[in-house]
Every structure is written in structure tokens, then in C-alpha cells.
Amino acid sequence: HLPVIPPHFDLLPIEKTESRLKLLTKLLKRKDVTAVINACDAGREGELIFRYIASHAGSKKPVKRLWLQSMTPASIKDGFKHLRSDEEMLPLADAAICRSEADWLVGINGTRAMTAFNSKSGGFHKTPVGRVQTPTLAILVEREEKIKRFVPKDYWEVHATFSVTAGDYVGRWIDEKFAKAKKDGEADPDLRAERIWEEKRAQAIKAKCEGKPGIIEEESKPTTQASPLLFDLTSLQREANGRFGFSAKTTLALAQSLYERHKALTYPRTDSRHLPEDYVPVVKQTFEMLADSGLKHLAPHALVALNQSYVRKIPRVFDNRKVSDHFAIIPTLQAPSGLSEAEQKIYDLVARRFMAVFFPSAEHLVTTRITQVGHAGISHHFKSEGKVLVKPGWQAIYGK
């Protein structure tokens, strides 16, 4: 009896919140209400919630859309000045309905099919299938299988200490003829220039080089490193997990609190890491807010950026083509106060990254030294690398 595809999808009230739905339905049906402003969450799922409520109430009244990027009074006033038309929001509404119905169709049909398949030998083995959960589970299973198939293999490295007039330095033996080999069409991560797969060979290299003089070839190159891009939700969650051990759920909750309760951050559920091209004046105002905020770990850097005119229209920051419904997560014009320790950590991550993208690139001097140790016409190469920070640039914001 598969597939199960209903001619239409019926909506039923959620018992727990049915009283609220009745109140909204009553308000929508009031005769003195001639038009409706949809102020649900500015995203796909917020659009879906409004459409479901309006559909359940049978409302045909004209609709305008309030689209907020932040919850500050100024942003809310600006949102009411620039209400979007209902026609403009139809593609987003269609996408939301499509997602909702696809979840149901994939879930009911996939679960019934896989449950039947896994129960064909007897018994009942419920096997849930979901549009998102099943592909995600497949990724985890694939990774687990790779881990199970992994066979540990010993390798050796030869490290040497060389003495020169200025002092000692360490070099690591490398195969100067090494070329990255392919395994199943992909580069084999186990193969590296410094790895020796036989202990006898490693001992032989050590014996031939120990106590022997070497010839040094040295090259120094200046390099620059730009700051990472502004945060979207995913990159913020990764950074917070790496630095503080916060789960993705915790980071979202903290960012949502900073957006809704404290009005200190812009809309967090964004997939963009850029800003609109006309947002330069707002960015300057945000730097001014940070400079005057009294946040001693942030204010001096904001002041430097303003005094040095760092805030300008940078293509890697301002790009309309890479801004969807929402732009990157940045501080609002409202200085934060009364934050919890965890909220302060998230705010600092966002604020530092926000300032960093406008600061100059960090400048380093990278030195590579190759020491050749010869024996009976055979040279062994030892590589030493050093990196010196010349100008910190944006890294000064992080105390470097």
C-alpha cells in the first residue's frame, strides 16, 4: 500500500497551544481588522507558522510582512517603514510548505517501507526514516565503517639537532623526491614526506647522518593572513564548540537570547557570512557603539578602527550576491548589559570577528631551512620551519 500520498494535507490544532490558536483566530476574524501584519520569525519556518494560522482561520485579509534583522527599537521602526508585500513572500512560503510536506511524505513512506523490509523475516522491527535524519545517519555509519576498517601501521621519523654559531636548531628528515600518492582516486593521508615505513631504514639514516656536517639552504618569504569571514550560525556553533565546548543547541539558545532578550546581536539563524553593500554606515555606527561601550577588551580596538578609517566597503565583507534572507551575525547598535558568562562569551566571539574583518591582514615572515647532510655521494635533507609575526593586524584583537 505504498506510496501514501494524500490528496491534501489537513491541519489540526496542537492541543497544548489550542487556546492561543483560538485567540489568534478570533482576532483575525474581527470585523474592525482590515489588514494583517505577519511579524512571525523572519525566516522560512516563521513564514510557515503564519500561513498555517491564517489558513486555519480562513483569513483572506490583506497581509504585509514585517522582516526584522535585529530586535532593537530602531530596527523595529525601520521594519515597519519597509513592510514587504505578501506576493514577495510567496516563494519563501512555498519552500516552507514543500519542506513540511516532504518531511511527512518521506517519513511515512520511508518508515513503513524500511520497517516492512526489516520485519520480513519475522517480528516487528520499526525503522524510522527521515528526510534529514537518515542521510545524516548514513554519514555517521560511513565514518564508523572507515574507523572499523582502519589498520594501524607503525612509521618512524628522524629528527636531528644541528649546531651553528647562533645556537642550536632542530630539523626533521624528509624525502626530497616525495610525491603525494593516490589511493582509490584520492590523496592518501597516511603518506607524508617525513614518514619512514621501515625501522631499519630510519636507523640507517640516523647512522649515516649522526655527527656529520651539513649544508644549509634558507629561504624567507613574507606572507599575509586575512581574518576569517563573519559568522553565520554554523560557523559560530563550530567556533563556540571548539573554544568553549558549547553544543550546537546551546550556542543557538545563547545567540537567540542575545537577539531577542538583550537585543545585542542580529538575527542568528542565518546562512550568510556577508553584509549588504549599503550597510557601511550602520557598521560605522556599530564601531562607534563598541568604542563608547565601556567594554575594555573591545573598545580600544574599535577606536583604532575608527581612527585609522579601517571601516570601508570591502568586497569580501559587503556582497549582495551572498546575502539571502538575512546577513551575517553582527553586534547591533545596542550595547550589551546584564549578560550571563556564557552569553558574554558568545557576544565576544561575534564582536571580535566583526571588528577583525575590517582590520588589515596579519603579516608573517616564514623561513624554511633545508639542511643537507651528505655521505658517500648521498644527501639526506632535514627541514626546519619558523614563522615570525611581523605585524599583528587583525590578530591584535585576539591579544597577539
Which ranges hold each PLM region?
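Long, highly charged, low-complexity internal segments
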Residues: 1-16, 26, 127-256, 260, ...
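Accessory beta->alpha helical hairpin/"wing" motif in late/C-terminal subdomains of nucleic-acid enzymes
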Residues: 266-290
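C-terminal or mid-to-C-terminal helical accessory/interaction module adjacent to the motor/catalytic core
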Residues: 22, 31, 73-162, 214, ...
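Active-site phosphate-binding and catalytic loops of NTP-dependent enzymes
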Residues: 61, 86-91, 112-116, 145-150, ...
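Conserved nucleotide-binding/hydrolysis micro-motifs of P-loop NTPases
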Residues: 42-46, 69-75, 162-166, 271-274, ...
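Short hinge/gating elements
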Residues: 4-10, 34-35, 88, 114-128, ...
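Hydrophobic (often cysteine-bearing) scaffold residues that line and stabilize catalytic clefts
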Residues: 45-49, 94, 98, 128, ...
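Intrinsically disordered, low-complexity regulatory segments
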Residues: 1-108, 193-196, 203, 312
